[in-house]
């Protein structure tokens, strides 16, 4: 196949005619004459698939002369050529055509008989004999096969060289096909013609081979060319063994083109070389003496490893890998793998640490830092300050020990010198010196054992979203002066993401822990393991939570081994702080390794303080406003908290404040653009919120002004955390058969609380004055209906037991409960009132709803100490341990028996 430049109409006519006529057959060994059109092509030889074997087909053949086929004359024809059969014509969009031709036989032009639309002459064809009858030719043929296969093998190995070296090569697939073709070839002439187009030779030598009609002479000439090139290759480099790490020679592709044969380059101590020696040499050695790129890279890597102060085991492995790297050529894949591994070792902070700011003012500074960044969270702050205090004391002890060790080392050094100077003195003096040295060494060893080892605690902060777990860990790092790194564990399903991938895998890399150490560059950072409760469980990819066991075990993490690094790494200096929203999904062994600190949701009072001190100023800055242009009052913020958000954290609160700020920004911009800035009112009121935030999303329950029998005010803490409120318990009776109907989307536990309360009331109806006889059933011919308003909101929990019992007594007795009194507590069949949770949130909600008196279980007395002072001042808190006590506080004017008058029967096993 060859492209034709600027074909004329007569050329296309001839091509079509010859295409219709088809080819011709030439008998073997015959020489016949026939007329044939001749074209002096200006294209190099192409293969059967239309691809160049070695050369670039777009480059011009400079020695063939700039002959235009449209203007060619008989003087431009070479006497010998190839008869070809046209197998197809392909058109191009540029107006050019491509002829697909297939070579048939070697020809000799005897005479040009026509020079019109095209050159036509009489030619003689020469076909190679089909059988080998000469033993000398057979021997030459075997030598040609052997040398050809050797040459193809070298070309295949050349593909391992970098592309920038300019060395041509064959892909393994093409090389195998060529080797198969050579092995199966039966005709010496055909193989000689084929190899003549592959071997490096001049254009004149190629023409010479074309003129050789005798097969023996042609094979001998090609063997000469092959032997010359293989000899040049062997003289230019030493190919000792073909192994997985051996590399081939370079070969200049331009040298195969006619007229561009370059003289070989000789290097000192070498034979004839090739034009472009490969960079970096072979087997990791040699190469161009002036090219120091790879040696410099390895030298720089060695300097980085030395500066990293590796552990003894890491240094040993690094030295071994450096030696391997020097023997590997940069073009091999193993070179990049080894270099990346060594770079990882150099980037890991084996001994580099940041000095903790543990001065005399450490605790005060840390306390101020935590208070400035977070409001409330006293338990968490207390634990972190305890850690800082312990760290401060340990450092003070270690500093004293280091001073004593230094003094003893100086004394031992002086004693040794005196011993050397007095070597000629009697042996008694030498014994005294030896005894001092031994005593000093023992004392030195004892002092080293007194050094305090810093084992950082592993804290787990558990709480709902948005309460400040992540920012709290960042504040700890700031207070300590350490670097901070966050590792997100949510959605991690592969153990290799924690421990790393083994180096045998393609694109292997270290795990998240080692990558974090590389990023911070120190061995004692603060690591935040975010969302540890969302780590995937056991699967075909391993168990990531099990991989975390070694990381978070203070007794083991000083010897943590990453699969990629495969060298023990000390993680004992890392302060790990994990966060979770729930403990339910954390495996028990992993949970046992961490110190759990619960962070409850913020109360309404805490949210108001956070909003006024932090969120409002932040959102004003974000929206281009200042405090003089928008004024948020505590009443406005409280309204946003109570009516537009219901969450444990403050994220939605910040969004709502941002919405209000943007609305005020629009008003301010409109007033300013209209030229009437005086019309803008920076003051925000509660009534303005509906304009910016829409209608209220949540309606706050308010204590009723009037009281009625069968209605009791209970207390509830929302599952979202941080918020609490009051909950009305409504009970009504009607004629019936003793059935109980429950509504209000009540959970199973809450339904059981109603049954327990009803059973206690029925059992003590006579003592309560509800029946005339102990044997009378108060539910005879009567049914009751228990309802909790806000029927669309799910409700559950045992804390309304006391409220249910008081509501039933109120209904049956006709006595109303004071509307300003609320109560919470679980009731048992014996009438005991037991502890419940969410006391802080419930009482804050009760104060906000207008409640004055609250009945709490006596077991919750400890929770009252954590209440804000304004809640303690605004509520009368009464602690009860039995339902009879609660009844006396609710209806103090009634005559009620005491608890001791009616002791319950308890079974003891």
Swiss-Prot record:
Domain Lon N-terminal, residue spans: 1-230
Disulfide bond residue pairs: none
Short sequence motif Microbody targeting signal: positions: 907-909
PROSITE patterns to which the protein is assigned, alphabetical: LON_N (PS51787), LON_PROTEOLYTIC (PS51786)
Localization per record: Peroxisome matrix; Cytoplasm
Major location (coarse): other
Binding site for ATP: 463-470
UniProt cross-references to CDD domains, sorted A to Z: RecA-like_Lon
GO cellular component: peroxisomal matrix
Organism domain of life: Eukaryota
GO molecular function: ATP binding; ATP hydrolysis activity; ATP-dependent peptidase activity; serine-type endopeptidase activity
An annotated GO BP: protein quality control for misfolded or incompletely synthesized proteins
Keyword line: ATP-binding, Cytoplasm, Hydrolase, Nucleotide-binding, Peroxisome, Protease, Serine protease
Reported consequences of knocking out the gene: Increases pexophagy. Sensitive to hydrogen peroxide, and histidine starvation (induced by amitrole). Abnormal sexual development; decreases the number of perithecia produced and enhances the growth of aerial mycelium, the amount of mature spores formed is decreased.
UniProt xrefs under InterPro entries: AAA+_ATPase (IPR003593), ATPase_AAA_core (IPR003959), Lon_bac/euk-typ (IPR004815), Lon_lid (IPR054594), Lon_proteolytic (IPR008269), Lon_Prtase (IPR027065), Lon_prtase_N (IPR003111), Lon_prtase_N_sf (IPR046336)
Catalytic activity: Hydrolysis of proteins in presence of ATP
Stored SMART domains: AAA, LON
Residue ranges of domain Lon proteolytic in the record: 706-893
Function of the molecule: ATP-dependent serine protease that mediates the selective degradation of misfolded and unassembled polypeptides in the peroxisomal matrix. Necessary for type 2 peroxisome targeting signal (PTS2)-containing protein processing and facilitates peroxisome matrix protein import.
Protein family membership: Belongs to the peptidase S16 family.
Name by which UniProt lists this protein: Lon protease homolog 2, peroxisomal
Species: Sordaria macrospora (strain ATCC MYA-333 / DSM 997 / K(L3346) / K-hell)
Gene for this chain: LON2
């Amino acid at each position: 196949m060859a492209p034709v430049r600027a074909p004329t109409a007569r050329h296309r006519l001839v091509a079509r005619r010859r295409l219709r006529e088809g080819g011709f057959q030439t008998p073997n060994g015959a020489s016949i004459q026939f007329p044939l059109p001749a074209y002096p092509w200006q294209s190099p030889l192409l293969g059967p698939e239309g691809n160049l074997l070695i050369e670039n087909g777009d480059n011009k053949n400079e020695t063939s002369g700039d002959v235009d086929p449209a203007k060619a004359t008989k003087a431009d024809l070479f006497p010998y050529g190839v008869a070809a059969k046209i197998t197809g014509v392909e058109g191009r969009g540029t107006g050019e055509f491509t002829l697909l031709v297939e070579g048939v036989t070697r020809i000799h032009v005897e005479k040009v008989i026509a020079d019109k639309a095209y050159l036509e002459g009489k030619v003689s064809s020469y076909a190679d004999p089909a059988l080998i009858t000469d033993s000398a030719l057979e021997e030459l043929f075997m030598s040609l096969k052997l040398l050809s296969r050797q040459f193809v093998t070298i070309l295949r190995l050349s593909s391992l060289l970098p592309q920038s070296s300019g060395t041509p090569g064959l892909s393994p697939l093409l090389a195998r096909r060529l080797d198969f073709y050579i092995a199966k070839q039966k005709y010496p002439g055909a193989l000689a013609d084929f190899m003549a187009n592959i071997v490096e030779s001049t254009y004149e030598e190629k023409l010479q081979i074309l003129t050789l009609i005798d097969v023996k002479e042609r094979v001998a000439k090609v063997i000469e060319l092959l032997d010359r090139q293989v000899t040049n290759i062997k003289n230019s480099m030493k190919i000792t063994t073909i192994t997985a790490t051996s590399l081939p020679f370079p070969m200049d592709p331009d040298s195969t083109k006619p007229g561009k044969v370059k003289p070989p380059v000789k290097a000192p101590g070498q034979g004839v070389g090739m034009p472009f020696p490969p960079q970096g040499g072979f087997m990791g050695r040699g190469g161009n003496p002036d090219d120091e790129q790879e040696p410099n890279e390895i030298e720089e890597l060695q300097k980085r490893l030395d500066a990293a102060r590796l552990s003894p085991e890491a240094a040993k492995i690094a030295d071994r890998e450096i030696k391997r790297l020097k023997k590997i050529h940069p073009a091999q894949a193993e070179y990049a793998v080894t270099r990346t591994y060594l770079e990882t070792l150099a980037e890991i902070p084996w001994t580099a640490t940041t000095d903790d700011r543990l001065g005399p003012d450490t605790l005060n500074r840390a306390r101020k830092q935590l208070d400035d960044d977070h409001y409330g969270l006293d338990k968490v702050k207390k634990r972190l300050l305890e850690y800082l205090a312990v760290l401060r004391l340990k450092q003070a002890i270690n500093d004293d020990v280091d001073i004593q060790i230094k003094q003893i080392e100086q004394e031992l050094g002086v004693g040794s010198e005196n011993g050397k100077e007095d070597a000629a003195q009697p042996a008694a003096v030498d014994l005294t010196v030896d005894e001092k040295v031994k005593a000093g060494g023992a004392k030195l060893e004892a002092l080293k054992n007194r050094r305090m080892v810093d084992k950082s605690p592993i804290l787990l902060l558990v709480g709902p979203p948005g309460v400040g777990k992540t920012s709290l860990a960042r504040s700890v790092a700031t207070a300590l002066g350490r670097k901070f790194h966050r590792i997100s564990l949510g959605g991690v399903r592969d153990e290799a993401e924690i421990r790393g991938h083994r180096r045998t895998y393609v694109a292997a890399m270290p795990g998240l822990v080692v990558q974090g150490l590389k990023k911070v560059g120190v061995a004692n950072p603060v690591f935040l393991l975010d969302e540890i409760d969302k780590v995937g469980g056991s699967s075909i990819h391993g168990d990531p939570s099990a991989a975390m066991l070694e990381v978070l075990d203070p007794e083991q993490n000083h010897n943590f081994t990453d699969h990629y690094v495969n060298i023990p790494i000390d993680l004992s200096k890392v302060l790990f702080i994990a966060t979770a929203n729930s403990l339910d999904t954390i495996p028990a062994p992993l949970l046992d390794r961490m110190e759990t600190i619960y962070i409850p949701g913020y109360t309404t009072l805490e949210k108001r303080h956070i909003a006024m001190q932090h969120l409002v100023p932040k959102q004003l800055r974000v929206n281009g406003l200042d405090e003089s242009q928008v004024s948020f009052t505590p009443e406005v913020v409280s309204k946003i908290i109570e009516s537009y958000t219901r969450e444990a954290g403050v994220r939605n609160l910040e969004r709502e404040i941002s919405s209000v700020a943007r609305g005020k920004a629009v008003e301010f911009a409109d007033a300013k653009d209209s030229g009437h800035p005086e019309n803008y009112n920076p003051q925000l009121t509660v009534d303005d919120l509906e304009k910016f935030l829409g209608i209220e999303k949540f309606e706050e329950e308010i204590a009723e002004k009037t009281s009625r029998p069968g209605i009791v005010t209970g207390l509830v803490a929302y599952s979202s955390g941080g918020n609490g409120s009051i909950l009305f318990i409504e009970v009504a009776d009607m004629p019936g058969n003793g059935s109980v109907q429950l509504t209000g989307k009540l959970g199973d536990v809450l339904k059981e609380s109603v049954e327990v309360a009803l059973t206690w009331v029925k059992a003590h109806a006579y003592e309560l004055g509800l029946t005339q006889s102990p044997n009378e059933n108060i539910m005879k011919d009567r049914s009751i209906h228990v309802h909790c308003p806000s029927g669309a909101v799910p409700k559950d929990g045992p804390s309304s037991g006391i409220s249910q019992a008081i509501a039933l007594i109120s209904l049956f007795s006709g006595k109303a409960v004071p509307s300003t009194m609320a109560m919470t507590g679980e009731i048992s069949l014996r009438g005991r009132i037991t502890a419940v949770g969410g006391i802080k949130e419930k009482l804050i909600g009760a104060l906000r709803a207008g409640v004055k008196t609250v009945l709490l279980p006596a077991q919750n007395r400890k929770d009252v100490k954590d209440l804000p002072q304004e809640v303690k001042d605004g509520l009368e808190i009464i602690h009860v341990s039995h339902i009879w006590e609660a009844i006396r506080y609710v209806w103090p004017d009634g005559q009620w028996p005491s608890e001791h008058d009616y002791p319950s029967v308890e079974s003891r096993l």
